[in-house]
Curated annotation (Swiss-Prot):
Source organism of the structure: Schizosaccharomyces pombe (strain 972 / ATCC 24843) (Fission yeast)
Protein name as annotated: Protein btn1
Family, per entry: Belongs to the battenin family.
Membrane topology listed for this record: Multi-pass membrane protein
Function text: Involved in vacuolar transport and vacuole pH homeostasis. Also required for cytokinesis.
């Protein structure tokens, strides 16, 4: 009996590790490819904005539309289809607007998949969430480093890299249908105090009433989580994505100081180091939990302010110190993410999946605001540098 239990836990852990890896992998590759997708003259915030708008829409609507009541097989199949379609669209597009449409398609898959797999994790043994989190961290590490290796070391074209990557989500279907054991719980978690949309009447008055009622109930349900869960996650994601998209492309040094051949190599290197931090911290939940989420969120914001000053004023000529800050940024981001969702596992089972959907919108909201800020922050920093004799941004 013990042997069977361990075997099942191992299968569940392996599946959720792969789920986290493959669901987030294309998202990371797209962000790592941001500079190559839009060029040096367009803010990388355009890529993030194209990614996060559909993602935010998915997460905001998840609790309102009761996504947790749909069958997982259909949800996962939809995610795989949208991933392949989005990456192929990006790869074969020539104009920036067309590429951004592909980014949006892939973003729908990633965000819908995250909510779905977090829902699925709540139906399994406690090993599922740590393995999911480790997988998402591994996706960051593997996605950023593989893009760096394929395009910088092996000189693969951006198109070839994207085409090869686009078919990886097919393994999600294999793991779900052929490897993942049956869950202990088979029925969707529904908050007994939450009023669902019981039916959709085609008469306009009934549709409006039901939607508004569901929206109100969602806001009521959200209130206990605002300060404890949603605020730390919002601030952390706003800070780290503003750094990654709005500031990091401008954190440049003479290439020879870092052992690089060109200024272009800095950005994917920052992304890789950041993802190492994310992977380590998201994997830490198996060993310890961190309760000081608001303190970490404020620390992340302080790092954002320092990197902005570094970009503008060149406070230090130490490339390795800045690289260390990027690593710490990844550690904080991953720590807050995994501890927020881990704490939701103690929520009453009838409310757990709805709580996950509700809290899940906070990270996307932070990323959305970061993308708007980055649209003007990155070019502003580049112009500020150029006015003071550092025109390195133009050389990326």
């Amino acid at each position: 009996m013990i042997k069977l239990r361990l075997t099942k836990d191992a299968k569940v852990g392996c599946c959720f590790l792969i789920f986290g890896l493959l669901n987030n992998l294309l998202y990371v590759i797209i962000l790592s490819a941001a500079l190559d997708l839009v060029g040096a003259n367009v803010s990388k915030g355009v890529v993030l904005l194209s990614n996060i708008v559909p993602s935010l829409a998915c997460k905001l609507s998840a609790s309102i539309l009761h996504v947790h009541k749909f069958k997982f097989a259909k949800r996962i199949g939809f995610c795989v289809f949208m991933s392949i379609l989005g990456m192929q669209w990006i790869a074969w597009s020539s104009s920036v607007p067309s590429k951004m449409l592909g980014v949006s398609l892939a973003a729908i898959s990633s965000s819908f998949g995250e909510i779905s797999f977090l829902h699925l994790s709540s139906r399994y043994h406690s090993v599922s969430l740590p393995c999911w989190s480790s997988g998402t961290g591994l996706a960051g590490l593997f996605g950023a480093s593989s893009y760096l290796v394929m395009t910088t070391w092996f000189n693969f074209s951006v198109r070839s890299t994207l085409i090869i990557s686009s078919f990886l989500p097919l393994f999600l279907l294999i793991m779900y249908f052929f490897v993942l054991p049956e869950s202990e719980s088979t029925s969707p978690s529904i908050n007994n105090n939450y009023t669902p949309i019981e039916s959709i009447d085609l008469r306009a008055g009934h549709v409006s009433f039901n939607f508004v009622n569901s929206l109100k109930q969602t806001f009521i349900f959200m209130q206990p989580y605002l300060l404890s869960h949603m605020f730390p996650q919002f601030l952390v994601y706003f800070s780290e994505y503003t750094i990654n998209i709005g500031v990091a492309p401008t954190l440049l040094f003479p290439p020879e100081k870092a052992g690089f051949s060109s200024f272009r190599d800095f950005y994917p290197t920052y992304q890789t180091v950041y993802q190492i931090g994310v992977f380590l911290s998201r994997s830490s939940i198996s060993f310890f939990t961190v309760p000081y989420l608001r303190t970490l969120a404020i620390t992340q914001f302080i790092i954002l302010l320092f990197t902005i000053l570094q970009s503008a004023l060149y406070l230090t000529s130490s490339y390795h110190f800045v690289l260390f800050l990027i690593f710490v940024e990844g550690l904080i981001g991953g720590t807050v993410y995994v501890n927020v969702y881990h704490s939701l596992q103690t929520t009453e089972s009838s409310q757990r999946e709805l709580a996950i959907s509700t809290v899940g919108s906070s990270d996307s909201s932070g990323i959305f605001l970061a993308s708007l800020v980055s649209l003007f922050l990155e070019p502003s920093l580049c112009h500020f540098q150029a006015d003071r004799g550092r025109d390195w941004c133009a050389l990326t």
